[in-house]
Amino acid sequence: VRAIASAFALRGLDPLPALQAAQIAPDLLHQPDARITALQMEWLSASAMRELDDEALGWFRRRLPWGSYGMLVRASLTAPTLGVALARWCRHHGLLTDDIRLQVSQSQGVASLQLTEQRELGALQEFAVVSVLRNALGVACWLTDSRIPLLHTTLRFAPPPHADSYRVLFDGPTQFNAPTHSLQFDAGYLNLPVRRDEAALQRMLQRALLLTVRP
């Protein structure tokens, strides 16, 4: 929530309307241990993305206008398998911003989705990295109509004060202060067929943030 408020500040805008739309009291911004519900986070993110016209919420030097991530999913929809779909998603993400690079690889039966920072993300590092990885995982699960359990998550930053919440964000163990940002899962999932079509995409886009915001 504080990171989203910072995105408004960077644009010289007031986050209060977005906070009110999500029924979040502004004084929670000053309470380090404050918590909100997944639904409130969904409402806040949607309001902020529309008002800022930036689905990246200030993470990158270039704005990602409303609809950018939907476009990425649509470009992957015709892929025969999840492996091809994720490779497309990562490549096309690089056309939107070169501040980060995404890559899918596999070795010894383990698939890895790796995020590399190509410039310092500063105070928004955690928010950006977690959001992009969560979105990619959500897209992968949605495309295959499957739940993809994680074997391991690695993150370059130190454990934040709310590190316990990572048990909800990512399955399996999470390693902080790691050499790379990555999600690791059984490589067999890369062979799953893509099971969604344009009609399913249109329905999903009505509440696309559910792919990222995990209840």
Whereabouts are the PLM-identified features?
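N-terminal low-complexity or simple alpha-helical regulatory segments
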Residues: 1-114, 135, 160-162
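Juxtamembrane segments at transmembrane-helix boundaries
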Residues: 119, 139-147
